Each structure stands twice: as structure tokens, then as C-alpha cells.
Regions:
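Short terminal alpha-helical segments
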Residues: 1-30
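Charged, amphipathic alpha-helical oligomerization/scaffolding segments
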Residues: 7, 11, 31, 35, ...
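Amphipathic, non-membrane alpha-helical rod segments
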Residues: 25-42
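Short, charged, amphipathic alpha-helical segments
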Residues: 26-30, 48-53
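Structural alpha-beta junctions
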Residues: 41-45, 60
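Amphipathic alpha-helical binding modules
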Residues: 59-105
């Protein structure tokens, strides 16, 4: 794996566990995750496992992330403006949390 990808993965592994991140910092995390998605073909199996760990944390923290991001931006508008692909599901955390809430209650 290249050093850039390794640095991005290490950054995400370190920052994803800090609940005091601002909405702007969380948007940066989503952007970095998209950068890594483009690099997935060149990632090692170990790197892909670490990326799965990051994805698991994103899903676990989805409610908090959506709340914090909504304080500074509208995810739906950001997706539309940036033409985000559905395969970059982390940009759809607002929809994921909404569907989860509907399913529960």
C-alpha cells in the first residue's frame, strides 16, 4: 500500500473515536473515507480490514455524526452538490439513521 493510503487510514482510526469532533471535522472524515474508496483496489487485505473497522465505527456512531454534521451542513445538499455515488454510503448516514428509526418505532 502507498504511504498516502496508510496515512489516511491511520488518521481515520485515530480520529473516529473522538466524540468531541466538530461537524466540520466529521465532514472531513467522510471526505477522507471517499478518498480511500477510490484507493481500495490497491489496498492490502490488512488495510481493507482496518477500513471495515472504520466503517463499523461510522455506523455505530451514525446518530451522533448526523447530529454534529447537521449543526454545520445539510448532508442531502452536500451529496447533491458533489454528485456523491450511493456506493459511498457514509455520505448517506442521515438516511440510514432515519430508516433505522422508522424500523424501530
Amino acid at each position: 500500500m502507498d504511504r498516502v493510503s496508510k496515512g489516511l487510514i491511520e488518521y481515520l482510526l485515530e480520529t473516529i473515536n473522538h466524540p468531541d469532533l466538530s461537524g466540520f471535522e466529521l465532514i472531513e472524515i467522510l471526505d477522507i473515507r471517499s478518498q480511500l474508496a477510490a484507493r481500495e483496489p490497491v489496498l492490502s487485505d490488512n488495510d481493507k480490514t482496518e477500513l471495515e473497522t472504520i466503517d463499523h465505527h461510522l455506523l455505530e456512531l451514525a446518530d451522533l455524526l448526523v447530529t454534529r454534521i447537521s449543526e454545520v451542513a445539510d448532508l442531502a445538499q452536500m451529496r447533491k452538490k458533489a454528485h456523491v455515488l450511493p456506493s459511498h454510503w457514509w455520505w448517506y448516514l442521515d438516511e440510514i439513521t432515519m430508516r433505522k428509526k422508522k424500523a424501530i418505532g
